[in-house]
Curated annotation (Swiss-Prot):
Key words of the record: Ribonucleoprotein, Ribosomal protein, RNA-binding, rRNA-binding
Gene name tied to this protein: rplX
Family: Belongs to the universal ribosomal protein uL24 family.
UniProt name for this protein: Large ribosomal subunit protein uL24
Native source organism of the sequence: Desulforudis audaxviator (strain MP104C)
Subunit structure comment from the entry: Part of the 50S ribosomal subunit.
Length: 106
């Protein structure tokens, strides 16, 4: 399992699967399983019984995890899906960089 190049809060585009082409923000990253949850992507319906917390019960929609290899980071400067590089600055801090335009990603 490789290192995940995306983290919570990143804007990504889905590159494969039924939701290919959709864009969204990462709600949660799960590094142990190499998966991410992206808002509005891979929405599934869950049937729940009535409980004290939810007396109505019924069907709820929520986002399910997708593999992190199925998303690409969107560069804020060039607005294109890009691979992620790493660079060490003069002061010793490591930053992620856009492979297309070379801009540092926050």
């Amino acid at each position: 399992m490789g290192k995940m190049n995306v983290r919570k809060g990143d804007k990504v585009v889905v590159i494969t699967g039924k939701d290919a082409g959709k864009r969204g923000k990462i709600i949660e990253a799960i590094p142990d399983k190499n998966k991410v949850i992206v808002e509005g992507v891979n929405v599934v319906k869950r049937h729940s019984r009535p409980t004290r917390k939810l007396p109505q019960g019924g069907i709820q929609e929520k986002e399910a995890p997708i593999d992190s290899s199925n998303v690409m980071l969107l560069c804020a400067r060039c607005h294109k899906p890009t691979r992620v590089g790493r660079r060490i600055l003069d002061d010793g801090t490591k930053v992620r960089v856009c492979k297309k335009c070379g801009e540092a990603l926050q």
